[in-house]
Amino acid sequence: MITGGTFSLGDFSIGAAATQVGDVVDDLGGATAITLSARLGYGSGGTSVYAIVETSLDQGVSWVQIARLDFTTSGAQKVVTVSGLTPRTSAATAGTLSADTALDGTIGDRLRATVVSTGTYAGSTVLSVRANVR
């Protein structure tokens, strides 16, 4: 079990419209909070791109979305913190989070990022996603 640290969830090259799934960072059992950072290094073109960060409560069999960070056609960085200590008094619904939202109260033992883009980006556009786990 990793007790904390900063982990890369991927550096995604953005070109034609696509969905990309990053590598899994696992062995995070015991995490109580995660600060997520997504940075779009914008080149040119494109329409929209967003990163969804997911966690798993069943060793990667299924995934729960815990944050979504959205970008359009300019470089930017967005940061959000998700707490595993926030009580959930109602069941979270699996599915798509709305733009620029997060879901507190749910942190599993692994994370991954999924990046979805529309339009065609060019000029070495990259979306980088990091997680600081504690």
What are these regions (language model features)?
Residues 1-134:
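Surface-exposed, low-hydrophobicity beta-strand/loop segments enriched in small/polar/acidic residues
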